[in-house]
Amino acid sequence: MGRRTTSLAVTQRLLVVIACLGTIISFTGTPSEASTATPACSTTNLSLGHGDKRSQATGEDSVTFTLTNHGKFTCHLYGHPGVSLYDNKGRVMPFRYTWAGTMYVSQTPPKMVVLRPGARAYFLVAKYRCDIGLVMKAKTIRVYPPNTTQQLVGNAAPFVDSGGFWYCKGGPKDPGQLVEVSPVRATIGYM
């Protein structure tokens, strides 16, 4: 009986420890009450930048973009940014957008990204090449950081000249008309 009571007590303590760890671990998973300790990032404290362009043998072109915290305080981002591409006349280009993840963009769920002042979050914008021909090129990209209502505007033209963000011939169902957007990530790894 003493041995059984000790075993039960150890099991109960272990469950309490696991429950406590679970609240810490959930901070990097889904938004929870733990996220209230770090406020959401405001667009006014973020800047949009870009990293490398990648071209895969599969015909996909992708660009890594960055969101940098220029504020004085630590903040967090969680989820997918809103993205739209515009032509040289300022018109939105009629791409189809997906945030669901496909063969080019990871299907792993979003994770909380905590940004100290000066730190960056990363996201990927990917598009299949134009096989039939080119119609118009993107000049600017507009990004709504996750859970914000103000946009950041960046230059998309450098990626067009190297094969990137073109609207394709072939109509709206052409594979080259689909733009894929990853969730924000803390590192550049697989997005």
Feature annotation, model-predicted:
Residues G2-V16:
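Bacterial N-terminal signal peptides that target proteins for export
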Residues G22-A40:
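C-terminal region of N-terminal signal peptides and the immediate post-cleavage residues
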Residues A34-A57:
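Low-complexity, acidic Ser/Thr/Pro/Gly-rich terminal tails and inter-domain linkers that flank the onset
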Residues A57-T64, M136-A138:
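Short, solvent-exposed loop/turn segments enriched in Ser/Thr/Gly
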Residues F65-K72:
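Asparagine-centered strand-capping/turn motif at beta-strand->loop junctions
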Residues Y78-R116:
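The feature marks short-to-medium sequence segments in extracytoplasmic or secretory-pathway proteins
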Residues R129-P158:
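Short, surface-exposed ligand- or partner-binding patches at beta-edge/loop junctions that are enriched
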Residues Q151-M191:
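Acidic, serine/threonine- and proline-rich intrinsically disordered appendage/tail regions
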